[in-house]
From Swiss-Prot:
The keyword Glycosyltransferase does not apply. InterPro entries: EutC (IPR009246), EutC_C (IPR042251). This is Ethanolamine ammonia-lyase small subunit. Its cofactor is adenosylcob(III)alamin. Catalyzes the deamination of various vicinal amino-alcohols to oxo compounds. Allows this organism to utilize ethanolamine as the sole source of nitrogen and carbon in the presence of external vitamin B12. It catalyses: ethanolamine = acetaldehyde + NH4(+). GO terms for cellular component: ethanolamine ammonia-lyase complex; ethanolamine degradation polyhedral organelle. Belongs to the EutC family.
Amino acid sequence: MDQKQIEEIVRSVMASMGQDVPQPVAPSTQEGAKPQRAAPTATESCALDLGSAEAKAWIGVENPHRADVLTELRRSTAARVCTGRAGPRPRTQALLRFLADHSRSKDTVLKEVPEEWVKAQGLLEVRSEISDKNRYLTRPDMGRRLSQEAIDALKSQCVMNPDVQVVISDGLSTDAITANYEEILPPLLAGLKQAGLKVGTPFFVRYGRVKIEDQIGELLGAKVVILLVGERPGLGQSESLSCYAVYSPRVTTTVEADRTCISNIHQGGTPPVEAAAVIVDLAKRMLEQKASGINMTR
């Protein structure tokens, strides 16, 4: 079926629907003239930083009918919309952005929180039974238990029997800790103290999993344990932090349903300062109800 037959079918269908039939465009009279192609809404550039705000706002749909609608849609979500297609395939810039975001997510899982950064924050650092990142990824069970050195350090250097114990751990996203720390921990500790609660010594657990907070709470006699841990990164979002709070945790009896989780803490989700206020209120309600997770009443 050639182009002329396709145009005839289109005209006959539109005529049967009572719509105006588009007139065929007359070919150029100049010998050797090439058909002109309308300019796309955005040009692809190899020099563009694929992680920049400009790259994220890029619209790859060529010749849109309502460009303003696409612009508004692009501003309203971080999802991969309005990227356009090249036949059945994604456009080059959309594909490169996808690959760049995937690489960034892998990097943040494999990166380490620098020891210098931990010291600069004035945090006590302890470890789980894990000794390196590779074992952390392959042996999650060992990331749920403190090393003997960590147990000794916590017993000797931390406040015992606090109302609330705050713990920071790298988890699966180093960037989540380093990017959000300054905006969540100071207001969180200040809010807990203003509420009249006895706050334990905050410390950093390297290679920690969520369940490690059960052993910490039992060891220190904490009523509520709040664990701030890096979330598993998504494509292009490597700075998302989670808070796992649990009341009176015990290694042998606490289950996942006993935890209350606040996730997606970062500048593009729940702002860290706002999350700090929510966590303070959550800790107060846990102490009032003496419960957490599904056992709490709303």
